[in-house]
Regions:
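Receiver (REC) domain active-site loop signature in two-component systems and cognate sites
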Residues: 66
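Two-component/phosphorelay signaling modules centered on CheY-like receiver
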Residues: 7, 14, 22-40
Length: 185
């Protein structure tokens, strides 16, 4: 357990591994066991969707060829219902048509082939999560900027000229004299 207060600790990114082969899921778990991720897994697209209802992951790592629902069908549904979940395909079937469909229909972050290189898989996951973190931070900062602009607009409306700055020829900021302090002429 960490000594840092709970509100300071970063939450571990949640990765959902979807593959109909237990051996593949197990190998991915072994590959990622020392990484700072919370892992969950599903043996089918339907099981993955059910898990997402109660505990949506940050990243979905899915196979393509699975019974009942293909990885591409799963990706399309996730894109529709959970657009903020990052999507990576890891499959042995890397035909151009499948790759194009995954990119266009599922908006995948990466398309990786089996057998995978552990370093490449870890890097793809890291980059995807970093992209997500940056996107979320940018959205937060944009919202903060909009809120600040609204405050300035309200201040300017209530106190015209409050946001204007006058400078002299040297560039120094001029501070207007308080009208009450000026002598009567």
């Amino acid at each position: 357990m960490s000594d840092a207060p709970a509100h300071i600790e970063e939450r571990r990114p949640h990765i959902l591994i979807v593959d109909d082969e237990e051996g593949v899921r197990s190998a991915i778990r072994r590959t990622l066991r020392k990484e700072p991720y919370r892992l969950s897994e599903a043996a089918s697209g339907a099981e993955a969707l059910e898990l997402m209802r109660s505990d949506p992951p940050d990243l979905l790592l899915t196979d393509h060829l699975m019974p009942q629902m293909t990885g591409l069908e799963l990706l399309q549904r996730v894109r529709l219902y959970y657009p903020d979940i990052l999507r990576i395909v890891l499959t042995g079937q890397a035909e151009l048509e499948t790759v194009v469909a995954a990119i266009n229909d599922g908006e995948v972050f990466r398309f990786l082939r089996k057998p995978w290189d552990d370093t490449e898989l870890k890097l793809a996951i890291h980059l995807a999560l970093e992209h997500q973190r940056t996107t979320r931070e940018n959205a937060r900062l944009l919202e903060l900027l909009r809120a600040q602009a609204d405050v300035i607009k309200r201040l300017e409306s209530n106190h015209p000229g409050i946001s204007s700055i006058r400078r002299d020829a040297s560039g120094a900021i001029l501070i207007a004299e308080d009208e009450r302090a000026q002598p009567d002429e």
